[in-house]
């Protein structure tokens, strides 16, 4: 089943900490390889809070909720940005239908 999460019932916008990079090579399965230029994407993860942990006990994406966090993620050195790698507090995230 699908599970949806929000910061609260008004469902304000939030962001995942992620990276993307261009890459040239062969991707796909051995049966259907695709050579050429690709965009690779990844999300930074952390230990789950108890809201997400009930559904996915291994990890959750790092969620950015403020302009300051977004600016840090996009522009700071890793020595500063790595401090964003933490779960939201349990009361900062809800499961919604």
Q: Which residues fall in each region the model found?
A:
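A structured binding-face within diverse protein domains that lines the active/interaction site
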Residues: 1-97
